[in-house]
UniProtKB/Swiss-Prot annotation:
GO terms for biological process: glycogen biosynthetic process. The keyword Nucleus does not apply. It comes from Clostridium kluyveri (strain ATCC 8527 / DSM 555 / NBRC 12016 / NCIMB 10680 / K1). This is Glucose-1-phosphate adenylyltransferase. Keywords: ATP-binding, Carbohydrate metabolism, Glycogen biosynthesis, Glycogen metabolism, Nucleotide-binding, Nucleotidyltransferase, Transferase. Homotetramer. One of its GO terms (molecular function) is glucose-1-phosphate adenylyltransferase activity. It catalyses: alpha-D-glucose 1-phosphate + ATP + H(+) = ADP-alpha-D-glucose + diphosphate. Alpha-D-glucose 1-phosphate binds at Y100, G165, E180, K181, S191. It is an enzyme of class 2 (transferase). Pfam families: Hexapep_GlmU (PF24894), NTP_transferase (PF00483). Pathway: Glycan biosynthesis; glycogen biosynthesis. The gene is glgC.
Length: 383
């Protein structure tokens, strides 16, 4: 097997508990996004567009739909004989198997997979972030700095630093301190969960971490601090572009709404950096004679007979006559009946909302889980 300069390992096993009923039956990276995508499509597309064609996807929680979506990687040009995409569930030993105990443990359990390719570098990625990034540029930075580890960082508002791992750097971006979700941060450089490591170095620290019974087996809590304490040369790679951790209902709704802005940074129409997904064969969208659509995305296969404003109507969904969809996301194959008002909501896949119902009041985000059947004349408002 030819040696790879760099392979990627995507952490995609998260339960996504903060997304509530949207992840009751599927992993967070498999949640629909933007009308025709799933969240994991972004990191897979980034790998392909960056020339990384050997990809391990580490799954765990409710993996069936995610595994089916990824398949052999054809939509992302990852169905290759020399490389490809591999779904890696928790390792099963003769004595039984355990779930991944943490992000570092997930990589540790797959050391043999990485060793098969004998890469010089490994890039560790999260499968639940929305962004477009050229990892080849980050690797170039890593080499120029002669770094052992490089962490991609993005500037965040000071009031949000408590949600992230925060890096403190010298003027040349060398990292001298890492604060995991600090109450009082010293900088606003937040880790994006994108790491490049020299593989031999990372493997050594993973094995040492595994032998520490008090470790959480986590990159942010254990591996990165341990490396810094050992004097490992670590740099921060500044990323300037759109990036969103869609781990909450609020952030998922915001990321979808961001797509509807005229000057949206993500720009899914950019032909130079396409976001690929599984393309189901759908008929063209149908817009009824009395439909009214404004500042919205309506994907192939949907039918719209009512009013849609600042919303996303996903593939295969139907909006009934005299219905109003405002500031909302209707996920794939949902059926909205006649005379329904949906205002500031996330409606899951395969949902039926029957006639004369009201969903949401435009203040808090109302969420309806997948496969729900909302009876006629219902009133559902987030409390």
């Amino acid at each position: 097997m030819d040696r790879k300069e760099m392979i990627s390992m995507i952490l995609a096993g998260g339960q996504g508990s903060r997304l509530g009923i949207l992840t009751k039956k599927l992993a967070k990276p498999a949640v629909p996004f933007g009308g025709k995508y799933r969240i994991i499509d972004f990191v897979l597309s980034n790998c392909s567009n960056s020339g990384i064609y050997t990809v391990g996807v580490l799954t765990q929680y409710k993996p069936l739909e995610l595994n089916s979506h990824i398949g052999i990687g054809t939509p992302w040009d990852l169905d290759r004989r020399d490389g490809g995409v591999y779904v890696l569930p928790p390792y099963q030993e003769e004595s039984g198997g355990n779930w991944y105990k943490g992000t570092a443990d997930a990589i540790y359990q797959n050391i043999s997979f990485v060793d098969n390719y004998n890469p010089e570098y490994v890039i560790i990625l999260s499968g639940d972030h929305i962004y477009k990034m050229n990892y080849a540029n980050m690797l170039k930075f890593h080499k120029e700095k002669k770094a052992d580890v490089t962490i991609a960082v993005i500037e965040v508002p000071i009031e949000e630093t408590y949600r992230f791992g925060i890096v403190n750097t010298k003027s040349d971006m060398e990292i001298y301190e890492f604060q995991e979700k600090p109450m009082k941060a010293k900088s606003t450089k937040a880790s994006m969960g994108v790491y490049i490591f020299k593989w031999t170095l990372l493997k050594r620290f993973l094995k040492a971490d595994q032998s520490d019974k008090n470790s959480s087996n986590d990159f942010g809590k254990n591996i990165i601090p341990n490396m810094l304490n050992s004097g490992i040369k670590m740099y921060a790679y500044p990323f300037r572009g759109y990036w969103k951790d869609v781990g909450t209902i609020q952030s998922l709704w915001e990321a979808n709404m961001d797509l509807l802005k005229e000057d949206n940074e993500l720009n899914l129409g950019d032909l130079n950096w396409r976001i690929y997904s599984v393309n189901h064969v759908e008929p063209a969208q149908y817009i009824g004679p009395k439909a009214n659509i404004k500042s919205s995305i309506a994907v192939n296969g949907c039918e719209i007979y009512g009013e849609v404003k600042n919303s996303i109507i996903s593939s295969g969904s139907i909006i009934g006559k005299n219905s109003k969809i405002i500031d909302s996301v209707i996920m794939p194959y949902s059926k909205i009946g006649d005379n329904v008002i949906i205002n500031k909501a996330l409606v899951g896949s395969n949902v039926v909302v029957r006639k004369n119902s009201i969903i949401g009041d435009g203040r808090e985000i109302t969420v309806i889980g997948s496969n729900k059947d909302i009876k006629a004349e219902s009133l559902l408002v987030s409390s």
